[in-house]
């Protein structure tokens, strides 16, 4: 995002409500058809799916995890510390393993929580971890600072 070669592709669906896609789409009176979502041809591509692997795209039972399988997309999980985050993160790791979706690493968001992270690291199917802080303003300065930390890191080399 901080260089001239980064391309931000348009969203196939842009929903107004901060809800799961199936719920937001229903409010807006549209149906999400995952087959209309085209994956751009790119050397480096990040597809963001907020909410979790079991979040439905639509009311037809098509989940984010189905999309990952269909398009053979390896995954980086994002984990934020809260009561239940160990369980949620490790359940996601297990689902990825069951569906044979490669887990490239886990990014922890927020302050370090040693016991939580130790439990996840011990039981996750990866040894590739990274941390980014929580920010109140996602801007170019924040992105540049975090990108510099990531550049050359073992996390990036392993994905």
Q: Can you name each region flagged by the protein language model?
A:
Residues 36-59:
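Switch II (G3) loop of P-loop NTPases
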Residues 46-48, 76-78, 107:
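Structural motif
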Residues 93-159:
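C-terminal lobe/tail of nucleotide-utilizing enzymes
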Residues 1-30:
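N-terminal phosphate/diphosphate-binding loop that engages ATP/GTP or pyrophosphate donors
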Residues 85:
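Class I SAM-dependent methyltransferase SAM-binding "motif I" and its flanking Rossmann-like core
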Residues 36-37, 63-67, 92, 116, ...:
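A general structural detector for well-ordered alpha-helical segments in enzyme core domains, enriched
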Residues 58-82:
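Inter-motif core of Ras-like GTPase G domains
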């Amino acid at each position: 995002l901080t260089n001239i070669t980064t391309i931000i592709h348009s969203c196939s669906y842009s929903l107004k409500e901060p809800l799961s896609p199936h719920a937001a789409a229903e409010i807006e009176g549209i149906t999400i058809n995952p087959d209309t979502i085209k994956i751009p041809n790119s050397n480096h591509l990040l597809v963001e799916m907020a909410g979790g692997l079991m979040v439905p795209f639509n009311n037809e039972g098509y989940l984010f995890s189905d999309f990952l399988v269909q398009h053979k997309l390896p995954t980086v999980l994002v984990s934020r510390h809260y009561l239940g985050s160990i369980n949620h993160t490790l359940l996601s790791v297990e689902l990825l393993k069951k569906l044979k979706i490669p887990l490239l690493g886990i990014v922890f968001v927020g302050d370090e929580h040693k016991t939580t992270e130790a439990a996840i690291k011990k039981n996750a199917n990866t040894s590739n971890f990274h941390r980014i802080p929580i920010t109140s303003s996602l801007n170019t300065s924040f992105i540049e600072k975090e990108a510099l930390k990531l550049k050359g890191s073992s996390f990036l080399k392993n994905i």
